[in-house]
């Protein structure tokens, strides 16, 4: 996984792949209603997560330069092909520095290259890092890794989210296939905020840097 910076100093360490993730703040509660989120597709068109309401949605927040994100995108493509007809929709959001430049055409090009290089079979766009952190309820005072995964049920409720330091199950094909299949089988049954969910235990992913 890729360790995300909490300061300029840590940012340089991250680039060298030597920073280690340590949670300093509790993760956002799950389940909870999903906030609206907008991403920009390589075409320049903006897409909103709300447009997928009624489907089970998996959102992968990634760095285009992160090998773990690249590997996960291949897993998600397989799941999209298998489960799409049942109402599953995957979405990718790139938010590293390479897609957050003043050059919109350059941002789109980097995102499109990520899609092409990894054979991605689901929509991937880009967004500003502050917007992503706000959506994930991550803080500048904690260290976090990518990819970060959020799974939203048909009613627009977040049912699973990666821990700041990563959740291995949410990057594992066999686990995701079963978990998503269970959510798809629920139909439109909502999850009540504040009640226990069937989300994976917060088992941290192996602390490998890229």
Positions of the model-derived regions?
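Bacterial N-terminal signal peptides that target proteins for export
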Residues: 1-15
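Hydrophobic beta-strand anchors of alpha/beta hydrolase catalytic cores
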Residues: 58-59, 90, 149
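Short active-site neighborhood of thiol/selenol oxidoreductases, capturing the structured segment around
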Residues: 49-70
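Structural microenvironment flanking redox-active thiols in thiol-disulfide oxidoreductases
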Residues: 71-119, 129-134
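Thiol-/selenol-based redox modules, centered on thioredoxin-like
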Residues: 146-210
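N-terminal "domain-start" segment that seeds a small globular fold
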Residues: 22-49
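Structural micro-motif
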Residues: 120-123, 140-150
């Amino acid at each position: 996984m890729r360790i995300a910076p909490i300061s300029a100093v840590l940012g340089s360490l991250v680039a060298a792949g030597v920073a280690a993730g340590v949670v300093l703040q509790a993760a956002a509660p799950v389940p909870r209603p999903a906030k609206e989120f907008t991403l920009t597709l390589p075409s320049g068109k903006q897409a909103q997560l709300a447009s997928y309401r009624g489907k089970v949605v998996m959102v992968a927040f990634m760095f285009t330069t992160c090998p773990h994100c690249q590997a996960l995108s291949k897993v998600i493509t397989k799941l999209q092909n298998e489960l799409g007809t049942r109402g599953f929709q995957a979405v990718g959001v790139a938010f590293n520095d390479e897609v957050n430049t003043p050059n919109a055409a350059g941002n789109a090009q980097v995102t499109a290259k990520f899609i092409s290089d990894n054979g991605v079979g689901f929509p991937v766009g880009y967004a500003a890092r502050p917007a992503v952190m706000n959506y994930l309820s991550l803080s500048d005072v904690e260290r976090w890794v990518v990819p970060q995964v959020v799974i939203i049920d048909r009613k627009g409720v977040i049912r699973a989210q990666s821990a700041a330091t990563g959740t291995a199950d949410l990057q594992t094909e066999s686990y995701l296939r079963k978990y998503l299949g269970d959510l798809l089988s629920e139909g439109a049954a909502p999850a009540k905020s504040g009640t226990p969910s069937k989300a994976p235990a917060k088992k941290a992913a192996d602390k490998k840097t890229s």
